[in-house]
Amino acid sequence: MKELTDKSILNHTPMMQQYWQIKAQHSDVLLFYRMGDFYELFYEDAKLASQLIDISLTKRGFSAGEPIPMAGIPYHALDSYLAKLVALGKSVAICEQVGEPTINKGPVERRVVRIVTPGTLSDEVLLNERQDNLLAAMLQDKQGFGYATLDITSGRFIVSEPKDFEAMAAELQRTNPAELLYPDTQHNLALIEHRRGLRRRPIWEFELDTACQQLMIQFGTSSLKGFGIECAHLALRAAGCLLQYAKDTQRTAMPHISTITLERQEDYVVMDAATMRNLELTHNLSGGIEHTLVAVLDHTVTSMGSRMLKRWLQMPTKHLTTIENRQQSIYFLQGKFDILQPILRKIGDLERILARLALRSARPRDLARIRNALQQLPDIQSLLADNTSGMHLSQLLSNVGYFDNLCQLLERAIVISPSALLRDGGIIATGYNLELDELRALANNATDYLDILEMKERKHTGLETLKIGFNAVHGYFIQLSREQSHRAPKRYIRRQTLKHVERYIIPELKEYEDKVITSKSKALSLEKKLYDALLDMLLPYLTQLQLSATALAELDVLSNLAERADTLHYVCPMINNQPIINIIDGRHPVVEPLMSKPFIANTLSLSDQNHMIIITGPNMGGKSTYMRQNALIVLLAYIGSFVPASQAIIGPIDRIFTRIGAADDLVSGRSTFMVEMTETANILHNATCQSLVLMDEIGRGTSTYDGLSLAWACAESLASRIKAMTLFATHYFELTTLPNKIKGIVNAHFAAIEYNDTIAFMHSIQNGAANKSYGLSVASLAGIPRDVIKCASRKLHELENLSNNIALTTPLSSRSLPQFTQETSPVIQALQEIDPDSLSPRQALDLLYSLKQMI
């Protein structure tokens, strides 16, 4: 936008002077300028909007000697166009006519009433109902980072102080803010430069004293000590900037933001950005939601429950009491979920409705939904009255409450199915206000009055074609046919002439018309006052209602987990203080439901005596699935969920790390190997003896010597220095000698059987190292031409005859070369490789199914 001086503004028309004065205060956003029944955009805003939302670009006369580019939308279509612009990361200032048009010269008074930005949305049509929409602020200095997030649709205000780049990256990955504020003095933008919704803010908005003052005013306190954040200076500075921005955009009080929480890393099982991505918790590696843990686990019946479940998955708790409370509640609800879930479904998104109530932007149907939600509470209390699961569920029910008086008020005040918008009327129920009933009766009884008047006039004039009608342009009228119009009495005043009829008005009908129109206008005005008064009556209950909504969301999550445990045959894990991960017959929670045949369960046993497993075996043999499934089982256990296994005992876990798969980071200019090494470095710097670490094929992105050396050194460091609980998958068979050199390491492998040109994967983990990698067999299965496979086989034979120092794999005897012409039965070969003493009953049964399919 071109800069305008005070003097140059005076060259414009009065209306455009007003526009420029308002636009100067909101130069960085699109200005929707209300003119009658339209929102208009001018100049550069009009040009940009016409491109972004495909509306016509035209001109609105001249001002200051230049044509005025203009584009506009109907006022009733505002929400749909806002949704498009916000999805594109744009912010919009809504400028309304707040004054009354008068006979005085000059434009009607206008004022920006709110600014819609990606991080401050509250209207349901603009939001993804099952995903948090966060506004965030970030600040960095030598001590680390300050980070604050606000969900304006719930009032959830959270701060943290990530200690380094990796921790901050993990927070951004987890929270995925729709809008991110950062100081204009921050020059290193590597962490955020490719994120959406970036907003530069002046550094003075991050000033500590101002931030503390802002927060104390918001919470109505004289100190921040009660929130436990008074020493978190970086977090406070970020929170202060964020709160000021929210106030600037909302232009109204925000009473639902009544507390602030400092999140500490030691309270949660920490997962870095790579781990959350690789485990595909909420999004798959392609960015979609199919085949993710959430896709399997989220059968919640309310949107607020769905959002809470995602927060649990992204921040598993380390508090054993919380975990045990959830487990006990799930166990109890396994006998109730089929009745409870249909009731909870009627609750709706109470959390976000209450935010709109707090912002005074609640629409009539929001109040109807609050009423409908409150009507379900007695049924919930009655159903769970026999709770035997302990104090946690009892406390949840106490927080849910009853709200009988509030429910009765809304039942009396709001019609069953109110209109969508207040301006359409028909919201306040009959009987709630006597004056409103009388005004409505005057308008609604028009038919009876007009029927009587029509009969009276027809009798008085003797004109059989006389009718009384109404249209929006001319109002009420008496209509006569053209043939009888010449007999109209003198008191009939012609109002409209049509081809076959004449229309008239008489003083009595005109007087009644004025009375009806006035009554409708008065009724609508009174209805608005009653509605505003109703909001005032609801606001004192806001804190209690928010507490109830949070409890209802948790009930939804717990009943959902109870249903999932029952349907998917999950068991309750035991969480204890011993250094152990013992999972019997574990199953992958995402892969298992996708399979048409039984999933082959596998066992994991890690402890302080055996804290690393070197896993070998062919590609597609099940190594990655096995590692991911165990990480997901541990994660599920730490959110309090039941898990897919026949038994699980899990000790203290402080972090989960994954180094699984990689691709070039083209945006940052990092190769696959560089990505792999960066993630590995993070693990080696931050893992502890209580961490679960998954390492898949470290070193494959470089030369054999380099890769093997790095893999060896990483495994040695994890096993002997860090002593982390580690699953280490590799194709470097040299690593299988590590158990002979370092205490705490054991070998395991996934078996496969070759037969002619095919390979059969057993998908069952067994003790000991694999005897070969089966690379050529897998290549053949993938469709590599037969002559290429034969050439590769010859080359492999040559390489195996070289010294061990240059071998690409563990040297194999000539008889262990790929047997593409072998005629031995695959069933016999499989039986030869099986160690029956190492198989659990479940594994033996699964193996039997696999052998039967090979016959």
Swiss-Prot record:
One of its GO terms (biological process) is mismatch repair. Belongs to the DNA mismatch repair MutS family. SMART domains: MUTSac, MUTSd. GO terms for cellular component: cytosol. This is DNA mismatch repair protein MutS. InterPro entries: DNA_mismatch_repair_MutS, DNA_mismatch_repair_MutS-lik_N, DNA_mismatch_repair_MutS/MSH, DNA_mismatch_repair_MutS_C, DNA_mismatch_repair_MutS_clamp, DNA_mismatch_repair_MutS_core, DNA_mismatch_repair_MutS_N, DNA_mismatch_repair_MutS_sf. PROSITE patterns: DNA_MISMATCH_REPAIR_2. CDD domains: ABC_MutS1.
